[in-house]
């Protein structure tokens, strides 16, 4: 084994020289240069500095503007709440621990940080899945005479919390566990060991299948069908410049949304699966830290893609920030043209 396993931790370094110490008790500067911990703390501070205002503004603007409080926007508020969970439950903790060079909050703190970071990330993940399903149902109309209402939106939000809890709670009660990972300043699910009594193997397989492969397949299917519907509408109305413009805009949005999903989750899931299937192989502390950066940064680019790209949200945000006036109102209004002749429009399938 090219690492050192201890009670509730795994250090990616063989203890041949006797320098390896518990990440709950001693600085881990023997793993990487102390400057790396400063960079980690600075990155977390940047995520908080940008992620908190954007997501908080989303909630505030929705409360202030009644026209935003529609069932189709409930899942976006849920996404903002999930990102705030990651900001307060994960990023603030990592700043504090990176300043010390180890997980100074102990075993209980590791469980709390790991739980909130996982819960927030999973709520965000399943919010994107529900969002894709909602757009597919509204635009492609696979169910005739179906009208999306408030009860459906609430069920969608409840579903995201149920699925997120189904991933974040088990490690607290004995099915897998939370341990320090990467540079040992943040905690995550144990992909690294086959510790007796925790059934890590079955949990990782369950998580990879249910909480990555299935969401990826659903998002791909829904946006693929949506894109086909938009292109069919555009082909049927080739003489309409409005329809052609809507088709191009929607296609661009779909591509951005799928790429954003993959950038967020593919690196982390791939590395976690590699570590799990190659336990005992040699890898450095940055091997898991860097992919985690992509997943954590979703608290910034998720609202940018799914909220700020939505014309209605963007207009209300600018109005709120500019004390009730939108200096770009003419430009915003001109770009909200909808296709009357078809059931597909850029506003109905936009990220919000």
Curated annotation (Swiss-Prot):
Sequence positions bearing N6-(retinylidene)lysine: 296
This protein's UniProt keywords: Cell projection, Chromophore, Disulfide bond, G-protein coupled receptor, Glycoprotein, Lipoprotein, Membrane, Palmitate, Phosphoprotein, Photoreceptor protein, Receptor, Retinal protein, Sensory transduction, Transducer, Transmembrane, Transmembrane helix, Vision
Pfam family, one: Rhodopsin_N
Cytoplasmic side stretches: 62-73, 134-152, 225-252, 309-352
Positions on the Extracellular side per record topology: 1-36, 97-110, 174-202, 275-286
Gene Ontology molecular function: any one: 11-cis retinal binding
CDD domains per record: 7tmA_MWS_opsin (cd15080)
Cellular location(s): Membrane; Cell projection, Cilium, Photoreceptor outer segment
Disulphide bridges: 110-187
PROSITE patterns: G_PROTEIN_RECEP_F1_1, G_PROTEIN_RECEP_F1_2, OPSIN
Entry comment on modification after translation: Phosphorylated on some or all of the serine and threonine residues present in the C-terminal region.
Superkingdom as given in the UniProt entry: Eukaryota
Assigned GO CC terms: membrane; photoreceptor disc membrane; plasma membrane
Gene Ontology biological process terms in this record: absorption of visible light; G protein-coupled opsin signaling pathway; visual perception
Residue numbers covered by motif 'Ionic lock' involved in activated form stabilization: 134-136
InterPro entries (alphabetical): GPCR_opsins (IPR050125), GPCR_Rhodpsn (IPR000276), GPCR_Rhodpsn_7TM (IPR017452), Opsin (IPR001760), Retinal_BS (IPR027430), Rhodopsin (IPR000732), Rhodopsin_N (IPR019477)
Annotated region (Disordered), positions in chain: 331-352
Residues of the site described as Plays an important role in the conformation switch to the active conformation: 113
Known glycosylation sites: 2, 15, 200
Family indicated by similarity: Belongs to the G-protein coupled receptor 1 family. Opsin subfamily.
Main function: Photoreceptor required for image-forming vision at low light intensity. While most salt water fish species use retinal as chromophore, most freshwater fish use 3-dehydroretinal, or a mixture of retinal and 3-dehydroretinal. Light-induced isomerization of 11-cis to all-trans retinal triggers a conformational change that activates signaling via G-proteins. Subsequent receptor phosphorylation mediates displacement of the bound G-protein alpha subunit by arrestin and terminates signaling.
Listed name of the protein: Rhodopsin
Protein's organism: Gobius niger
């Amino acid at each position: 084994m090219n690492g050192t396993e201890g009670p509730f931790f795994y250090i990616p370094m063989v203890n041949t020289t006797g320098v390896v110490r518990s990440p709950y008790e001693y600085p881990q500067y023997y793993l990487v240069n102390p400057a790396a911990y400063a960079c980690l703390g600075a990155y977390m501070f940047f995520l908080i500095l940008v992620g908190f205002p954007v997501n908080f503004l989303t909630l505030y603007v929705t409360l202030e503007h009644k026209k935003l409080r529609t069932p189709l926007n409930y899942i976006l508020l849920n996404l903002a709440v999930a990102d705030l969970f990651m900001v307060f439950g994960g990023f603030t903790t990592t700043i504090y621990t990176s300043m010390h060079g180890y997980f100074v909050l102990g075993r209980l703190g590791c469980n709390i940080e790991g739980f909130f970071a996982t819960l927030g990330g999973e709520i965000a993940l399943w919010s994107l899945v529900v969002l894709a399903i909602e757009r597919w149902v509204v635009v492609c109309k696979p169910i005739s005479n179906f009208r999306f209402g408030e009860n459906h939106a609430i069920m969608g939000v409840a579903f995201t919390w149920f699925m997120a809890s189904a991933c974040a709670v088990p490690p607290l009660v004995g099915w897998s566990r939370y341990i320090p990972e990467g540079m040992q300043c943040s905690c995550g699910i144990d992909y690294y060991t086959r510790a007796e009594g925790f059934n890590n193997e079955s949990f990782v397989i369950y998580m990879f299948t249910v909480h990555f492969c299935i969401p990826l397949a659903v998002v791909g299917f829904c946006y693929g069908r949506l894109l086909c519907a938009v292109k069919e509408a555009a082909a049927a109305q080739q003489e309409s410049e409005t329809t052609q413009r809507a088709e191009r805009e929607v296609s661009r949005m779909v591509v951005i949304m799928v790429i954003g999903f993959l950038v967020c989750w593919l690196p982390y899931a791939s590395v976690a699966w590699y570590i799990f299937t190659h336990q005992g192989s040699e890898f450095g502390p940055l091997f898991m830290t860097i992919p985690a950066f992509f997943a954590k940064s979703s608290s910034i680019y998720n609202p940018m893609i799914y909220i700020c790209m939505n014309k209605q949200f963007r207009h209300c945000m600018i109005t709120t920030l500019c004390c009730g006036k939108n200096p770009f109102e003419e430009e915003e209004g001109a770009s909200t043209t909808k296709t009357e002749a078809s059931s597909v429009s850029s506003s109905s399938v936009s990220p919000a």
